[in-house]
Amino acid sequence: MAYQKIVFVALMLVLAVSAMRLPDQQDQDISVAKRVACKCDDDGPDIRSATLTGTVDLGSCNEGWEKCASYYTVVADCCRRPRS
């Protein structure tokens, strides 16, 4: 009986987590406002006068974005949308 309760609780947790996920839409990036700005390599030498054109992404850059700085580690990358 305890095994059935554990399985039932695990299934309910999986259902709750999957119901909270938002659909992945390429034209709508909700998390942009929550990102932190960062300085790309070509923004200029001084951080105070440079325009911060990149955003910090944990892990690696999102699909369709490019890594624009070489000074971030495996934990985070400075990324931006490719310039046309």
Swiss-Prot record:
Keyword Secreted annotated: yes
Identify this protein by name: Delta-thalatoxin-Hhe1a
List the Pfam families: Toxin_4
Note the Gene3D superfamilies from the entry: Anthopleurin-A
| Main location as per UniProt | secreted
Propeptide residues, per UniProt?
20-33
Q: List the disulfide bonds.
A: 38-78, 40-68, 61-79
Report the family membership.
Answer: Belongs to the sea anemone sodium channel inhibitory toxin family. Type II subfamily.
Keyword list, A-Z: Cleavage on pair of basic residues, Disulfide bond, Ion channel impairing toxin, Nematocyst, Neurotoxin, Secreted, Signal, Toxin, Voltage-gated sodium channel impairing toxin
Q: Where is the signal peptide?
A: 1-19
What does the UniProt function comment say about this protein? Binds specifically to the voltage-gated sodium channel (Nav) and delays its inactivation.
Cellular location(s): Secreted; Nematocyst
- GO MF annotations in UniProt: sodium channel regulator activity; toxin activity
Name one cellular component (GO) term: extracellular region
Q: Which organism is it from?
A: Heterodactyla hemprichii (Hemprich's sea anemone)
